[in-house]
Amino acid sequence: MQYSLGIDAGGTYTDAAIIRDSDGEVVAASKALTTYPDPLHGMKTAIDRLDKPLLKAVKLVSLSTTLSTNTILENTGFPVGLVLVGDYIIPGDLPTNYWIAVAGGHDSDGEELKLLDLDSVKAFALKVKDKVSAFAVSSYFSTRNPEHELTVKQAVLKLTGHPVVCGHELSRDLGAFERAITAFLNAQLIPITHKFAGSITEECKSRGIKANLLMLKCDGSVVGIEEALEKPIETIFSGPAASLVGASHLSRRETCAVIDIGGTSTDVSMMQAGIPELSNRGAVVGGWQTRVRAIRMETSATGGDSHVWVKKDRFNVGPKRVIPLCRASVLYPGFLEKLRKSRVPRSHLSESVQATKFFVRTGFEPLELNKQERLIYRYIGEEPVSFGDLLGKLKQRPSSIALDSLIRKRLIQAIGFTPTDALHVLGEYNEWDTEAAFSGATMLGRLLKQDPADFSSGVKQRVAGNMALDLVAYLVEGMARPEIEKVLSGGHFTKFRVELPVVLLGGPARAYRESLESLIDAEFLVPEYADVGNAIGALVGKGIKRVEVLIKTRKVSKAGGNEEKKEHGGEKASESGVIEDTLHREMENEFIVFSPAGRAKFNVHGEALEYAEKLGRKLVMEYMTCAGLDNENLKVELSRKNLAPKSWSGPPMETKLVFVGVGTPLPPSRTFHSNKSPDEGQTNRKNYKT
């Protein structure tokens, strides 16, 4: 009997699940707290809680992890040298001090605009080679002709031996600056991803697991570890992608919306006909716009660990994240007694100052602290301390700015009342210490003249309302959120109806189902194993490869020159993708095919089209083979779009062909099997441990 193991390292929890290959049954699952900065320790704990005999029969391991995302957000990637080729405008700051802009680049037809200044590139590479761990290069219109990027790559690799990432290798979209950022971030992640993959491989070997290793990408597809090592940037936001794929699989719904209720945030996304819906724009991470294709999602900073705090006779939810009181009481013996004794004057109340808020060290070593940070950090130890404790030790009010800075630097963590605590009070989620949650609700509710149950019910309803708002905002793009809130308020005798199933994932998913049904008319499903759906999503993700091929028509003189350039100074196109129609004299057509494999020229449109179709399918098949995916059941769909102005005659000005191949890394017989309907409870599990 063979099995497969899926692991997802999320913002709060790391989930693991084992699926039996013969029938797709989930036979074991576990959870552990995610560890920072290295998620490997949390993964080890989750694996430790699975049955050893099953682990030794595992033949495939698939991962989704926050490693890439956290590295970029925390700016802890390796130093990279950036080479910009061409005369394009840099719209903002660059993410590195090690960069150079040199002459070169191509036009929209892939013709060379200027000779590449390779000497300057070589001098730069030699100058910074001991200061960086990798290089990135982005050339103007490299998507139409990657020659200059490849030349730079070969030269820098020969001189330094460092990895070199090209923009055209990561994206076929226009936007030279965004490709440069994407290539830079990818280069930053390569050393970290190599180390992580090596650690996972060694961990599997030490447990007797002889398995192929896959990673989930942010578009919901899986990829072999070799490609993941080359393009780690594509694994950012793989967690939301895992939840989407897992929800579709567990609910047996190929088309559905998904609400993933995590500890840090709540994410809304959508699956259509078994394929994740992707964003038209690239993913934004750490404030940087990339050209990485990711799932389209609506994200709010409201999750199970969002801080609930009171000020001016009202409670607020988030946006900051804390350790729930109920969990802190289990992690730190004696915490409950400290909580009960904590007091804060009503006049001092703020997000940082609550009777229910505490602080504790994380164990990371401090590096650069200012005077205020050092002073506060000295009085925060390995046991939680309250605001009142700090006030007594400092003899002055602790700086909220310094506390927030210490939290951002991951030197301390905050503890406070959360939606998870509210569910414990209501008896709808009982994973940790209910008594601590009840004490917190009593203290905060007293400020609003509410009993613990009423206060907790209000928190739960607020969180459910935020989920409903995010769902409608996702499905009805462009609708103003205040208008959505008016309908959801229930005061207009109206209600939104969603005509596709909505799958809820996350530990507390079942607790919010009834509240969501009161707000929106929809079929809400909570499948079995909803609380480890991300781990299952990491495992059952399909192999999806998108290849774009562009055929562009241009006019050339019969002598072979580009008449358009002679008459009009070249086609008026830029990396923004804007193309201006021009008038043409009596000339011949030439058809240029642009693809990831390079460019090719034809004199007959039909020949160009035939070449493009064969090439696109070939590239999809080659990718699937390299990724170790099942080619026998591979489906390749082709969509074609022609572009031509009204005055245009003859073959289209442009023809865009998009090939989408869908395969599976696992036997095609694998489908989720359960005797229960998708919305039945999570009972009678096998080997489920927390």
Where are these regions (language model features)?
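N-terminally biased helix-coil "hinge/interface" segments that flank
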Residues: M1-T690
